[in-house]
């Protein structure tokens, strides 16, 4: 039996109230950016030029890549029962990459600076390549979604494969921004690109699980728990892989004598916010969601699976914070083996970074914008199937 996708009517008071709330939060986020841009209302400094808004860039790209890979399960891996989620996942992937590109725009400040990536393209710079990868990734997402709307089976399979390949390439490039920085002890790691990919799939899938639950519930459409259970098991398995990557990277750095102080600062200093961002991710973002999914009492309950997905996705943002901030606040060792007694700058000392309310509002505003795009999209486009059950597949 073929999958039948339909728009929602979207004529209820609750629908319009949700649109207004999301639009207001989005506008508040952009207003916070204007104030920050004019008056510098942030916690950044010369030592910490990348803050929480910058942490949103790899986070949003990861959510996009994760959603897109889930969307391609039917086309690439021939798991036809997940075709019912292919459109909604691809649409969310496009929405999240828009948020990522806007995060970059907020960081750049002046939009015409985007042209510099073309005018002064540097083939040896990962930043130059990422400018091409991100923009082309959005185009691929859009074409992939379009061929799904047109029911072009061969083109859909081809675009699904290309989308997965490009999603892996994009997130590897994002991870390479940090892992290729050899001078920063807490950045340089060959494990960062593959860890980024796994983290992208888990966070994207976790948030998609919650998105599916709430969408089908509030549109009063049938959602088979077996389908969600299958995705939840994939989700749990990949979280275990992510935990393994984090453990290996931590142990690798811990065994390097030169990194002893840096490792102690990140993993064993409770007075540091970086310490909490890491351990909260491990305990509440990985361990607890895995227990929820694998526990027979909670693993079949859509509400618990939704909670696990939201918990993991939220704390992956803490992982992005843990990745970006420590490499900046911890000092570089300019002369290994020597102690610098006189410094006229903050170089050589651990500095602090606390995100301002205006930085948080920018991130929250971008998230609200993504869900505004989604809420309007389900009214304008046929993204959601009438019913999502295992029997409703394309033969």
From Swiss-Prot:
Consists of five subunits: an integral membrane subunit, a cytochrome b-like subunit, a cytochrome c subunit and two iron-sulfur subunits. Belongs to the NrfD family. One of its GO terms (molecular function) is oxidoreductase activity. This is Hdr-like menaquinol oxidoreductase integral membrane subunit. InterPro entries: Electron_transfer_protein (IPR052049), NrfD-like (IPR005614). The gene is hmeB. The keyword Signal does not apply. One of its GO terms (cellular component) is plasma membrane. It is found in: Cell membrane. The keyword Iron-sulfur does not apply. It comes from the Archaea. It is a multi-pass membrane protein.
């Amino acid at each position: 039996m073929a999958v039948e996708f339909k728009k929602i009517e979207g004529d209820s008071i609750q629908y319009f109230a949700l649109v207004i709330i999301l639009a207001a939060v989005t506008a508040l986020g952009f207003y916070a950016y204007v104030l920050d841009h004019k008056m510098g209302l942030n916690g950044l400094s010369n030592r910490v030029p990348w803050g929480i808004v910058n942490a949103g860039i790899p986070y949003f790209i990861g959510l996009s890549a994760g959603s897109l890979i889930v969307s391609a399960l039917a086309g690439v891996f021939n798991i036809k029962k997940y075709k019912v989620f292919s459109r909604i996942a691809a649409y969310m992937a496009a929405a999240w990459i828009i948020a990522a590109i806007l995060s970059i725009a907020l960081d750049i400040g002046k939009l015409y600076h985007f042209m510099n990536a073309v005018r002064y393209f540097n083939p040896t710079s990962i930043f130059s390549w990422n400018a091409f990868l991100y923009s082309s990734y959005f185009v691929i997402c859009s074409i992939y979604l379009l061929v799904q709307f047109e029911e072009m089976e061969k083109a859909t399979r081809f675009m699904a494969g290309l989308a997965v390949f490009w999603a892996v390439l994009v997130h590897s490039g994002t991870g390479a921004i940090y892992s290729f920085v050899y001078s920063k002890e807490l950045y340089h790691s060959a494990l960062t690109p593959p860890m980024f990919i796994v983290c992208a799939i888990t966070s994207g899938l976790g948030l998609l699980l919650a998105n599916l639950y709430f969408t089908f519930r509030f549109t009063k459409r049938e959602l088979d728990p077996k389908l969600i259970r299958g995705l939840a098991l994939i989700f749990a398995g990949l979280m275990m892989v992510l935990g393994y990557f984090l453990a290996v990277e931590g142990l690798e750095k811990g065994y390097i004598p030169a990194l002893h102080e840096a490792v102690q600062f990140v993993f064993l200093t409770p007075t540091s916010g970086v310490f909490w961002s890491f351990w909260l991710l491990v305990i509440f973002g990985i361990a607890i969601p895995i227990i929820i999914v694998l526990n027979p009492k909670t693993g079949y309950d859509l509400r618990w699976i939704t909670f696990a997905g939201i918990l993991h996705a939220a704390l992956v943002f803490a992982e992005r914070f843990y990745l970006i901030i420590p490499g900046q606040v911890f000092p570089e060792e300019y002369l290994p083996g020597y102690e610098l007694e006189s410094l006229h700058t903050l170089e050589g000392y651990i500095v602090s970074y606390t995100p301002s309310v205006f930085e948080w509002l920018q991130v929250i505003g971008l998230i609200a914008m993504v869900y505004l795009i989604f809420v309007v999209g389900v009214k304008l486009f046929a993204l959601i199937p009438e019913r999502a059950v295992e029997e409703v597949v394309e033969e």
